[in-house]
């Protein structure tokens, strides 16, 4: 509006968006608390914020995020992305955030990709699920090299933060998921689709209710 010569305060715009247009901001639910576990083994940061990969399946990043059903129940998603092209190679959701969820996600990714023994580095934070005996031993058994962010440094795993923000802003925060099956299907299948298919096409096909009455508007290529 400024380019058209109009000047309004943020308060005025907010008032008319609410009263005249019926538009409301989407507020993210409060992040659920988790209990820290005792680490079995902590690894150094081998990536050091170098998120460039020369080829697929060279550097992967992984993390957990929380998602909500309409009734307020929380579910946890574990995802892995390939830094070569930022594609999602695995996404698994469950009721509990555990080392088993992390293992199942990595196992799913490895089964879907052709990985040369000892060629893959998996970067994560220092959450107990990734430092647990079960997970570290699983990584060793499949010849995956672990790398970890320094505690408290979210920028060390920035690609995962960016992916989860996009997932929530363009998908899960816009729709009311009545059942966990609806949530699991969208969160686990949508990221695996070709990039030419937008979220709106897939969500509309499932006839999911839109939150707050608002509408939401493959070849692997390297990301520079």
PLM region descriptions:
Residues 1-55, 153, 208-217:
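Basic, flexible linker segments flanking DNA-binding modules
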Residues 140-144, 166-224:
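C-terminal domain-tail junction helix/linker
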Residues 36-38, 124-126, 132-135, 149-168, ...:
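RNase H-like two-metal-ion nuclease catalytic core shared by retroviral integrases
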Residues 16-19, 109, 134, 138-142:
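Alpha-helical structural signal in soluble globular domains
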Residues 73, 92-115:
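Active-site beta-loop-alpha junctions of metal-dependent nucleic acid enzymes
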Residues 49, 53-89, 95:
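An active-site-proximal beta-strand-loop segment
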Residues 13, 47, 63, 80, ...:
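Mobile genetic element proteins and their domesticated derivatives, centered on retroelements
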């Amino acid at each position: 509006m400024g380019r058209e010569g109009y000047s309004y305060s943020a308060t005025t715009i907010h008032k008319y968006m609410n009263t005249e247009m019926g538009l409301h901001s989407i507020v993210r639910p409060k992040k659920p608390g988790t209990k820290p576990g005792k680490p079995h083994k902590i690894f150094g940061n081998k990536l050091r914020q170098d998120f460039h990969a020369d080829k697929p399946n060279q550097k992967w990043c992984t993390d957990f995020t929380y998602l909500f059903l309409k009734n307020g129940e929380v579910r946890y998603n574990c995802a892995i992305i390939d830094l070569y092209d930022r594609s999602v190679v695995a996404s698994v959701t469950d009721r509990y955030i555990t080392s088993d969820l992390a293992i199942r996600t990595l196992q799913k990714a490895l089964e879907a990709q052709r990985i040369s023994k000892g060629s893959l580095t998996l970067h994560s934070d220092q959450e107990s699920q990734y430092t647990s005996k079960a997970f570290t031993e699983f990584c060793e058994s499949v010849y995956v090299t672990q790398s970890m962010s320094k505690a408290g440094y979210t920028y060390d795993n920035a690609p995962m933060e960016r992916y989860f923000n996009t997932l929530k802003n363009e998908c899960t925060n816009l729709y009311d998921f009545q059942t966990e099956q609806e949530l699991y299907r969208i969160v686990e299948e949508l990221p695996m689709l070709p990039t030419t298919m937008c979220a709106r096409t897939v969500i509309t096909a499932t006839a999911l209710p839109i939150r707050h009455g608002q509408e939401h508007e493959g070849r692997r290529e390297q990301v520079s």
